[in-house]
Structures are given as structure tokens and as C-alpha cells.
From Swiss-Prot:
Entry-linked PANTHER family: FIBROSIN FAMILY MEMBER (PTHR14429), FIBROSIN-1-LIKE PROTEIN (PTHR14429:SF20)
Biased segments, Basic and acidic residues type: 13-28, 99-123, 817-837, 923-949, 1029-1045
Region Disordered, annotated ranges: 1-86, 99-315, 443-462, 719-753, 809-880, 910-961, 991-1045
Cross-link (Glycyl lysine isopeptide (Lys-Gly) (interchain with G-Cter in SUMO2)): 858
The protein's name in its UniProt record: Fibrosin-1-like protein
Bias type Low complexity, positions: 48-63, 910-922
GO molecular function term, any single one: RNA binding
Species this chain originates from: Homo sapiens (Human)
Modified residues (Phosphoserine): 340, 790, 937, 977
Composition bias, Polar residues: 183-197
Superkingdom of origin organism: Eukaryota
Family, as annotated: Belongs to the AUTS2 family.
Modified sites of kind Phosphothreonine: 989, 1010
Extent of Pro residues compositional bias: 270-280, 741-750, 998-1015
Amino acid sequence: MEAKVRPSRRSRAQRDRGRRREAARDARAQSPSSGDEPEPSPGKENAGLRGAPPRGAAPAPRTARPPRRRRRESSSQEEEVIDGFAIASFSTLEALEKDMALKPHERKEKWERRLIKKPRESETCPPAEPSENRRPLEAGSPGQDLEPACDGARKVPLQPSKQMKVTVSKGGDRDSDDDSVLEATSSRDPLSDSSAHAVSGRGYSCDSESGPDDKASVGSEKLFAPGTDKGPALEKSEAKAGPVPKVSGLERSRELSAESFLPTASPAPHAAPCPGPPPGSRANPLVKKEPPAPHRHTPQPPPPQPRGLLPTHVPASLGAFAGHSQAAANGLHGLSRSSSAPLGLGKHVSLSPHGPGPHLSTSHLALRSQAQHQLHAAMFAAPPTLPPPPALPASSLVLPGHPADHELLRQELNTRFLVQSAERPGASLGPGALLRAEFHQHQHTHQHTHQHTHQHQHTFAPFPAGLPPTPPAAPPPFDKYAPKLDSPYFRHSSVSFFPSFPPAIPGLPTLLPHPGPFGSLQGAFQPKVSDPYRAVVKVSTCWEGPWQGRTLVPPGRPRGARDSRSLQKTWVGVAPAPLSASILSQKPGRWCAVHVQIAWQIYRHQQKIKEMQLDPHKLEVGAKLDLFGRPPAPGVFAGFHYPQDLARPLFPSTGAAHPASNPFGPSAHPGSFLPTGPLTDPFSRPSTFGGLGSLSSHAFGGLGSHALAPGGSIFAPKEGSSVHGLPSPHEAWNRLHRAPPSFPAPPPWPKSVDAERVSALTNHDREPDNGKEEQERDLLEKTRLLSRASPATPAGHPVSGLLLRAQSELGRSGAPAEREAEPRVKESRSPAKEEAAKMPARASPPHSKAAPGDVKVKEERGEDEASEPPAGGLHPAPLQLGLGRERLGAPGFAWEPFRGLELPRRAFPAAAPAPGSAALLEPPERPYRDREPHGYSPERLRGELERARAPHLPPAAPALDGALLPSLGALHFPRLSPAALHNGLLARTPPAAAALGAPPPLVTAAGPPTPPGPPRSRTTPLGGLGPGEARDYSPSRNPPEVEAR
């Protein structure tokens, strides 16, 4: 086809050049590419100009391949002299590599020899000869070469015909191309070299199926640069007319663009060498050369190959450029199928406007690609419009074509073939645009192109657990992300956008930044890869880039442009192993935040369920909660947070008797903690945090959780959370409290109620053990209520507010309220709750610190002692908090986040130093065991916590804060420290507590890094009283507790 197209496009100069080339090629037919001596035209055919020496046996294979490539064979085999540039095509990578092996000067010498011989032979040989040898190796010949280069493997057609040989030359494309190019221009030697090297070596010789597809670009740069090609071209008769044809070339570019489609489309008789070189046939000679090789495109009869110097030269300059462009297009398509059309178009179309710039090649490629694709669209199965995109990517990306890339390119081309034909009928720039679209947003990128829209469909395919249900939920929003994520920049970001949860599936900080659509967690703690697999693969792929690393993307493709289709196909066709859901994982790095979140939640839930099965006490309070607690974005997916309701069922199921469990949503507990609805909101997180109780261990991508929940791994925390998950509700609260260190303040109150309920239930569970404790706690609660009631406790402080609120509740409830508070304490059984009580005590130092406080502390301490053997309140706190760290930290808060937080804040510093990770871990175990028998009685837990606090309290409020904060705060660290929790929510202890909240807990949990400062801050803000007062209360409690201990 191209042969015919070429005759149309080819100018007389080109035909002459082609003849000379053919003559030269005949002369150097023996070693076309390296062949210093032209081979007989058949020999050339066999050896292929460039490809022959490198390919050696390529000619025969080419003969075998031509059938498919014949259509594009026109330009596949030879080194096309397009716009005076020799574009070498290689039938095989081997030929290309051989040629590449030649050093530039060697290659140049070869080319020069060829050029010398070519001019002689070209002049000597009639166009037919050249057509037979290389089809007149004119512009068309290079096109053929290019095409053969692209088709190298395919275009073995018509070895007998020289033209075919150009096609056949595919393997020895370089030969024909180089001959043509070198003949056409001495510049072409370097260019040919470059072209052969880039195009053949990396160029689009094999572009279609070889791997070097995208190489056109490589050659293109050099090809485009040389106007010198014309020198050799001038050497040829047509070379002299070269300058004129540049305009002609432009005209022809368009002309041939049109012609290309037709002529290229019509296969020309392979044997039909350019008969006479009629002047009108300058394009025809182009095609004509190809005609000998049957073209897929146009059965244009090979027109006489006029030696249109114009076309020849334009092609030399532009043509070579276009040749590369063409090669790129062909190579990109790796189809070489449209090689003939691209050759004609490439030569001429490329000639005109883009002759000068290598990038023009891309444009030319687009033009030529269009023609080429239109001609070979069927061949590539890409719509005619589609061709331009491949062409563009080919030219732009073709450059890098590496052998390794060839495989990828081939795959990509295949993918493209599929996708192009189906997907992008009319986007010549589609690839770039698509690529961008693919890159575009999705994961701020996620995967270069894995982002294309199909990416989200994979949503959570890779995600382990229950992702299937949720993944689809967010894909639409993330669609935009997925594509962008595809971009190298972004792909990795999600590289995926929301790498957060799925990657951290196990401990991903569901609690921290719920990905929601855009969980902050994603960026903050987690690699932005929602899907670790995709993110990693895509990142590696993406970062390697379409340019090189991208396994799926042809190296030669521009990163963002034109890769889209390529990438899309690549990803789809070549889904990287890591992206088994690759096509899913078109946005590998970025799953939709929601999908990730849901997947994570599902996974977590499953894990929790498993743990619950293993350890009923774990009672995955957050099992469902996690699902919902995990919903990352507070406001993003309020509904997701409602699943906390599911969590509630979990809670109820977990702590069947723990109203707080259900309360999660409706009750005054985490769900209530924050508005039940709000829980879904930012505070949905708290609910989430309920899930985060277990997430707290996962907070920060499981960072905080594991570290924070020394007692339990991510799941251990859940376990501890459920176990000492005081009541499940407490666990929910734990999650809430520690999960949303900033959120806990509000929920704590509802939690108080819920906690009380739960604590009542739990107390019933524990009442035998805790009867005394309850009584004592009642006293404590009364004292606390009084303290709370006392105005001393600043209402401004969230804790104060909590206490006041609790007071109101207690006051309203009277003894029952006290009992509720008592249960709360029991529930909290954590310094947090006691601290809350202490806060009221602080508020009313006399009353609080009075015997009642002591009694409370002491009694609770006794309970703690009984309940929690571990000495050092920190252990109980760690028990709750250590477990709470995973999730129990919240339980301490669960009863009353503020009180718990307060205590933890104060105790956190002391506790941090005192408890240490080991201490926290140990007590959680024991409290967990103790609790198990007690059914996680909130009171028992509270007692344990208080016991834990007792030692901490002796250190004073700071000790208590340290103790509790390390366990509560540190445990809550996943989210925030209790202080941070309260500060954020209550702003009670601002920076110190807040700072303590998130970062300090890590340290605090490990040691007493922040105890000194935060405790004071907490003490003052929490108590709303002076640190001394707060400490007074806690110390008063602490000493008795210590005594009890």
C-alpha cells in the first residue's frame, strides 16, 4: 500500500533518490545495514539495508512477515529517506541491535558507503530496480524502511521484490532505510545512524511489535535536526531539488496525508517498482516503492517515481523527520501496518510543517498517523482517528524504545490495538488527553495511566477482605483521581490517592484520616497509595514512567501525553502483576478513598470478627465500627460512619449487655459522643474511632495502633479494647476517645450515659467482684458528682462541661446518676474516667479531695487492685489504655472521654514515664484477663484503671496524666493523645494536650516524654482548677489508690 502511496507522495527527486538508494543498496545489499557493500537488490531484500547485517536472516523472516505488514511494509523495511533523513527500519530487534552495535561513525561510514553506492546505484538502477531492491528507496523507501522497521517482523513481504525488500528489509530495514537516507543525505548518515540507531535500534523499527516501537522519537530527534540529510539527498538528483519540496513537502504532507490513506491503503504490486518516475508521481514513487511490497492501505498502482526533488528534499528534512514521525507512528503502533501510509505521509506530511523540529515529527506522526491509521486502522484495529495518538506517542515516546521496552511496547501496542480500535476511534491526541484524563485527578495521581477511567473499576479488587461491596461506591469520585493518579506524578501519590487504608489494611489508620474520598490519612501517614499493590507497581511503573520503567507503557511514550491510551492499554493489556486488578488498577495507586476506606473497614471488620471468635472478650466493639469507624472522611461519608450503627450491632453483639455498644450511634457514646449523625461527620470518626478503638492501633496507618497498643497488635488492641473494651461501648468509646482524641470531648458525655448504662450492665457482670467497688465508686461518683456540680470545675473546660453535664445527669439521676457515674467510673475504670471524676473533684477540691475523693479513689483503687493485679496504675491504665491504645485507651475515655482524657492528660506524663510500653502492655493483658471473667465490667475496668491511676496519681496529677495519657493518650495516640482528643474536641487542654495527643502519645507510650508539661496543662485546663487542685484531687486519689495498690 505504502508503495503505492509512496508513488503518489514521492517526488521525482525522491524517486531518484530511491533509485539511487536502491542502486546503492544493491551495491551494499550484502550488508545493507552494516553492509558496506550494497547487496544485490534481492540480497538487500534478504539482508535488509540496516537490518540485514544486523538481522542477517531477517530478510527471510521478513518475507514471512510481510503478509501482515505488507500493508505497512512500504516503510517498514527500508531506511526511509524521509525529508532527506534516512530512517532506518529494522525488521527485527536483532537487526536493530546489530545496527545499534555499530558506533555512530561506523554506521555513518556504512551509510556513507551506501550513500556513495546508492547514488551510483540509484542513478544506475531504474526506479523499478530500487523498487525491487528497496522499492525505489526514495522518500517512500525510507517510509518503507520505516514501515518495515516497524513491521520488521511482519513485513517480510516480497523479499523478491526490492520494494518488498524494503518491507522485507524490515529486518534489514536499516539497510533500505539507511541506504535511502544515506543516499539522500550524508547528514543522513548520522541521522540514519541516529535514525537507524534510534529508530532501528530503538526507533520504530519493530515499533509495532518489536519493542522498539516508540523509537521513532529517538531517531526523530536526530532525524528531525538534520537538514543535512539533504546533502546526501542533494548528492542524488532529487537532493538538489530538496529545498523546494519543503513547501511541497508541507503540501504533500497534507496531500499525502490524504494520498497516504488511499495509496497506502491500496497494496501496490510488490514487483511494481517505480516505473517511470513521472513528475506527478512524486508521491506515487513514495508509494511506488512500497507498491512492490503489498500494502494494506491503498492498492494504488505504483506510480512512476518522479524524482521530485522537492518531496525528496522536503522529505529529507521533513521527510526524515516525518519518517521518524512515521516510524514513531508505525513503531508506536508497532504495526508498521500503516507503515506505508505513514511513510508517505510521514515523508511528505511530516516534511512540510514539521521538517525542522523533532517534535513536529509528532505532529506529522499525527497526520501521518491519521493517514497511516486510517490506512492501517483496520490493521491496527485502531480507528483512523486513533492513529494520530499512537503516532504522537510513537514520535514523542518512541525515542526511548529500548529492547526491554519493545516487549512492553509490543504489549502496549497490542493493548492499544485493542483499546484503540474500540476505545479511541477519533482521538489523535486522545492518548495525551486520555493520558491526562487518566492521570488527571484520580489520585493526584495515581498511576500514570492506570488512572484512565477504567481504573476505579478495579476499585478494591486487590483489596483483601470485603472490599468488593464498597469499592464500587467511590470509583466515580475517584475516577477523576484515578486518571490523574495514573500520572507519574500522581500515580504514585496514590499514587494512589488513597493508599491509606488498603495499604494499611490491617492497621491502616482508619481512624486517622479517613480517606473518605480524600482521607487526610492518605497523604499524611500512608503512602498515598490506597492500593499498595497498585501504588507500588504503578509507582514503580509510573515513575519508571512511560519513559522507561513502565513495564506496561512503552518507554518511548511521553509521560503524560499519549500515554493515556498506551498506558490504559498497557495497564489493561499488560496489567502488571502487582496490579492483578490492574485494569482495575488503572489507578493503581489510588483506590477511591471510599473504596479503600470501605475495603479497609471490611477487612478490619473481618479481622475483628475473627478475633472476636478467637476471643469473645474482644467483642470487636469496633468490628463493624471499624467498618464505619474506618470511614475516613468525617463529612465525606457520614453514612459510612453510620455503619457504626452496624458497629453498634457489633457492640451490642460484642458487649450484648453493653448498651454503650449500641449507643455508639444513638447512645451517648461514641456515636453520641459526637452526634450520632456527626459521628459520621468529622466526629463520625469518633464513631469511626469506635472502630478506631481497634483502629487506634491502626491510626496513622496502624502506626499508632501497634505502637500505641503495646498490649495488643492492631487486633490485639481490638481484643484489648473489647476485652478491656470495658463494655463494647467502651471500646467504641475507646476508639472514639482515642481514635478522635480531638473528638472525644463531646461524646464522652453521651458516653458517660452510655458508659453508665454499659457500666451498669458490666457492673452487673462484675457486681460480685465489684459490689464493693461499686459502692465505693458510688461514693466516688457522688464525690465526683458533687465536684462536678461544684462550680469550681470550670464549665468552660470540656471536661468541666462534661463533669457539669455528668453532674446534671447525676444530679438528675440522684443516686442513680451517681450510680451511673459510678458505672462510668467502672466503665472507664480508667484514669480517664476517674480523672473526669477527679476533675469534678478539682472543681470542688474540698469535696472532691475530701474523704469522698479519697474513698472513691481508694475504693476504686481497691477494685482496681482486685481487678487489676498489675501494680502501678499505669498498668491498669495501660490495660485499658494499653489495650485502649489499640482501643482500650478509648475505654478509659469511654466512660467519660473528658474525665478519662483529663486523667490521662494528667496521668499521661506520669503514666508515660511510669507505664512504659511494657507496663502498658502487661496490664492490658491482665485487665483483659481480669475483665474477661467480669465481662469487661466497666466498673472493673474503671477499677483497674483507677488502680492504674492510683500509682500514677501518687505521682500527682501529672503522674496520673502521664499514666493515663501514656495508656490513654499514648494509646490514643493513634488518633491523638487524650489531651489532644480533649483539646481538639474540647479545646480544654490546647496545644500541650493536643500536641501531647498525637505525637506525644507515641513518645509517651514509650516513655514519659511529655508527662511533665502536658499534665500541668491538662491539670489546669482539665480541672479548670489550678494544677495543684487537679493534682490535689488526683493526688488525694492517688495516695489512696497507691495505698490500695
